[in-house]
Amino acid sequence: SIPIRMGNEDFKYIHDIYETADSELWLASVGMGVVKARIAGTPDNPVIVDAQRYIINDGELGSNYFFTIYAENETNLLFGNKGYGVFRYNETTNGLEPVSTHKYENMTLNNILAIGKDSSNNYLFGTSYGLIKYTSETSYQLFNAKNGFLNNTIHAILRNSSDNFWLSTNLGLINFDTKRNVFRSYGFGDGLKVVEFSDGAAFRDSRTGTLFFGGINGVVAIRADGRSEQLYMPPVYFDKLSIFGEQYNPVSYTQLYLFL
């Protein structure tokens, strides 16, 4: 382990790490904010030669729960915070600034657990209350259980292609198309043995395109093998019948003709 001292205490509770090309580490902590650290030494004996801490609300513990780091490039970094939304690193001011001051209708939307971005520059914010497709402070869409999602909590987001993403939840995986705003869910009934996933436990193999999602009882791998998606037609059941406003029992009809 490499100790990181910040004043009189160790920097701990690290939840996410991002490494830049010039041996610089960004660390997101659940409770202690964000640290930028420079690594020196050798591969067998790495040392931290410089570390700078970034906090919000004067370092108050409950305000500095940072769960995830998303890098648009080497200098444009976003940090997901539990309770206070998304922050961006400002290289000019050398500080964190909020991406949005929007007051969502549900405060759990500010619990940011995962971040992604599509080809149209829409951000995807995985929250405790669903997925936010964010264009600007005044333009965003929310997708959650009310829209048919398996579960509201989005633990991780991985990009499969330019506008196709996989999301992990507490009840399975969701394949989401940001271009068409359509999705398909995969849970226990679809053969998944792991359905309850963990915060940030996701990885994309850039060489093979394979996606990995970690859950409480194992790992799910999604391989980009070029197979075409199979069409699925769910069973259709009629439980009500209304003819000119009058209710009938569908079971009473041996045949039902619908003219469109």
Descriptions of predicted regions:
Residues 24-27, 76-79, 122-125, 164-167, ...:
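Conserved beta-propeller blade signature
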Residues 19-22, 71-74, 117-120, 159-162, ...:
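Residue-level detector of Asp-centered blade-edge/turn motifs that repeat once per structural unit
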Residues 11-17, 25-30, 61-67:
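Solenoidal tandem-repeat scaffolds enriched in leucines and small polar residues
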Residues 5-13, 44-47, 58-64, 104-112, ...:
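Residue-level "micro-hotspots" composed of small/polar
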Residues 30-34, 82-86, 128-132, 170-174, ...:
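Loop/turn residues immediately N-terminal
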